[in-house]
């Protein structure tokens, strides 16, 4: 290890929890109009609705009788109190994605920290990073990315062209993506690793560790 460059010394997995988290359980976005969101995510992006929540109040009193708190305590009882509706969508790999419509709150998310990737006109300008930077959906191949780009544009959605993260000689390969926003200006991405591409055969994944000056914790796990 001592003879390797710092970016080649990254400790990739460590500790008793290694490998126990199998994927994303769910993500939640705020939306300004639930009907618009359902139309967009179900009818345009093709996600399956698997759960709907009736309007509920986001306070400790309303939670009692609806959820079991193992500690017996309800924290942050006075922190928030809004009227919320929620819809859950299922992705093709079984992971869940959800949207909140919140009464009395203008959910104008600020920009992604990589907002230059989104095309002009796809979302409102902003001054600080969003709480959830962006949501990226996975598809199986580059052909599906092309299909979604054309499909979204046919639906009137402002969508970027393909962003291909690979060197001109395929020396570094990563994602192929498109960028767009939902009707509530939440920044979205559809991406693929395109694992069926023959270019992955024999690929050296050490190339994914690119930071020449990794933060110290990446190199030395907690003892």
Could you tell me what each predicted segment is?
Residues 30-107:
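Core segments of cupin and vicinal oxygen chelate
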Residues 92-94, 102-104, 140-142, 183, ...:
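Beta-hairpin (beta-strand-turn-beta-strand) motif
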Residues 1-17, 23-32, 87-92, 113-223:
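Vicinal oxygen chelate
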Residues 18-19, 76-80, 126, 169:
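Short Gly/Pro-enriched turn/cap motifs at secondary-structure boundaries
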Residues 108-114, 199-202:
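A short, polar/proline- and glycine-enriched secondary-structure boundary/capping micro-motif
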